[in-house]
């Protein structure tokens, strides 16, 4: 096989369909847009959600709920993720970000009890679930709310 003999795989390259190039091309005259009407015009077509004048679904349904501007969103860390640290290490939000476990601190970090902790750690975070707190102290570690 030589470079000039290389051919693309069968069916991997499709020729662009050129419309409006004479009736014998199969896509001449109306260029696949049908006859007259809004959709046949340049820039024609209806906006998203338009239902032909009928009240659209998003207006028929009632508004629901609200966004609490005081809501706090915590960065979640599970116990099994803390096993990357050495025994006796101090785990703080800064250390978690440097280790790549948490992307951003948000309103603080919350430690949850999923997984199993195998190391003795001193963990400093904004919040702890009961199960996480119990698991850390059971391994001889300590918990500090910051």
UniProtKB/Swiss-Prot annotation:
An annotated Gene Ontology molecular function: structural constituent of ribosome
A GO cellular component annotation in the UniProt record: cytosolic large ribosomal subunit
Compositional bias annotation for Gly residues: 23-35, 42-51
Pfam families: Ribosomal_L27A
Keyword Ribonucleoprotein: yes
A biological process from GO: translation
Function in brief: Binds to the 23S rRNA.
Record note on quaternary structure: Part of the 50S ribosomal subunit.
Record protein name field: Large ribosomal subunit protein uL15
Native organism: Streptococcus pneumoniae serotype 2 (strain D39 / NCTC 7466)
């Amino acid at each position: 096989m030589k470079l000039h003999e290389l051919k693309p795989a069968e069916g991997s390259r499709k020729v662009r369909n050129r419309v409006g190039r004479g009736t014998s091309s199969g896509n001449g005259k109306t260029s696949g847009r049908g006859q007259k009407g809004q959709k046949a015009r340049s820039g024609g077509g209806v906006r998203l959600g338009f239902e032909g004048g009928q009240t659209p679904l998003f207006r028929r349904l009632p508004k629901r709920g609200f966004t609490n501007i005081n809501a706090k969103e915590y960065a979640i860390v599970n116990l099994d993720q803390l096993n990357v640290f050495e025994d006796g290490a101090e785990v703080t939000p800064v250390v978690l970000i440097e280790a790549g476990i948490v992307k951003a601190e948000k309103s603080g970090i919350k430690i949850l009890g999923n997984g199993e902790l195998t190391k003795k750690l001193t963990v400093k975070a904004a919040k702890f679930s009961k199960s996480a707190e119990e698991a850390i102290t059971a391994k001889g570690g300590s918990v500090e709310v910051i």
